[in-house]
């Protein structure tokens, strides 16, 4: 058989199967685990909202495309629970629902709070009682 057949088989059968498997795993976690209930805000990678190096997160991750990276900053109390790179699922935040990675840290004055990195032209948002699951 030729190599293109195997590539097509991989693309059309194996990859969708793996995606569905991951979706089922996340759904199981949502149904069986207690979420962290937080206030969610958004932030932009600009000096006015960060520090003098807005394109480098507290974990050292370099931001090249804010929307693509799916980054959240967490308050210091949540940082004790979630280490750098932890994958989390956000539920109840409308268009912000989905999978994100813990890569940044918020100011110490905040508790039980996450900040979602958005693009420079996006509108700022604040939502309360958002569910966050460690996946």
Model-derived features: where do they sit?
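Solvent-exposed, well-ordered loop and adjacent helix/strand elements within mature globular domains
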Residues: 16-135
């Amino acid at each position: 058989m030729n190599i293109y057949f195997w590539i097509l088989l991989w693309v059309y059968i194996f990859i969708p199967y793996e995606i569905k498997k991951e979706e089922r795993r996340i759904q199981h976690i949502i149904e069986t685990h207690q979420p962290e209930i937080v206030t969610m805000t958004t932030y932009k990678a600009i000096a006015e909202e960060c520090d003098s190096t807005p394109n480098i997160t507290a974990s050292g991750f370099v931001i090249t495309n804010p929307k693509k990276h799916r980054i959240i900053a967490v308050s210091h109390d949540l940082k004790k629970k979630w280490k750098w790179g932890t994958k989390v699922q956000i539920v109840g935040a409308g268009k912000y629902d989905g999978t994100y990675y813990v890569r940044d840290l918020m100011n110490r004055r905040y508790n039980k709070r996450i900040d979602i990195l958005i693009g420079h032209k996006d509108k700022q948002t604040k939502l309360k009682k958002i569910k966050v699951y460690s996946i």
